[in-house]
Design a protein with these regions (language model features):
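Metal-dependent phosphodiesterase/phospholipase catalytic core, i.e.
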Residues: 1-109, 132-135, 149-151
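C-terminal active-site rim and adjoining tail of enzyme catalytic domains
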Residues: 30-32, 111-212
Length: 212
């Protein structure tokens, strides 16, 4: 839906393009801004040569998204995440000579997450990064993270919601202590932290001499 990020309501598939374009964006705290909803092409044009971009749910529209990234020359900046089997992703990427980055999402405490992680390991596939999700930091989670880093991939942690990071979320970093959140994530081996509070995270990383 467009509920979380704009002042509009409803599912994208039920709303016309013109209606969506009239919506304005909201801040992370739900406050309306004066910024109109951009198209993917407009957003990527602003990001070109500046930052990496994660297109959420982008795999479902890979062909359309890739056509735009190739047109703008930003394909190497764009990341797609998902939970699909290795061969499914490989087959899709084989259709093109130039692809966006792809990162598997591993819900390591769920059977399907463990199976996907084991599949990557058994096939000898080393993605650029894994997003590991967990709601309770168990020995199994710790072992998975260690294996990710030891295998040559980066460890991506999503700190947006408690259920994705065992309670080590942005809100806790803001209301309690950045060190208790971001410090612990770094100690776990995380080298990529997805955040809704970039200023807070950047200040912490710079203070620790950990920003690259």
């Amino acid at each position: 839906t467009i509920d979380r990020t704009t002042n509009g309501r409803g599912r994208v598939c039920d709303i016309t393009y013109d209606t969506i374009r009239r919506c304005v964006l909201k801040t992370g705290h739900g406050v309306k801004t004066s910024l109109k909803m951009p198209t993917l092409r407009e957003a990527l044009a602003v990001c070109k040569d500046r930052i990496a971009v994660n297109i959420d749910q982008g795999y479902e529209y890979y062909d359309l998204a890739l056509a735009i990234t190739e047109e703008l020359g930003v394909t190497d900046q764009v990341l797609i995440k998902g939970k699909r089997p290795v061969e499914t992703v490989s087959a899709k990427f084989a259709e093109y000579g130039h692809n966006m980055m792809y990162m598997p999402i591993i819900d390591i405490l769920k059977p399907q997450g463990r199976e996907l992680f084991e599949e990557y390991a058994s096939k000898g596939v080393v993605p650029l990064a894994y997003e590991v999700c967990w709601d309770d930091y168990t020995p199994q989670v710790e072992a998975c993270m260690r294996q990710v880093v030891a295998g040559g991939s980066k460890l991506w942690v999503n700190s947006l919601w408690d259920s994705l990071c065992g309670g080590l979320s942005d809100d806790k970093a803001f209301t309690e202590s950045p060190d208790e959140v971001y410090g612990r994530l770094l100690d776990m081996g995380a080298s990529i932290i997805q955040t809704d509070r970039p200023e807070l995270l950047i200040r912490y990383l710079e203070a620790q001499g950990r920003r690259k």
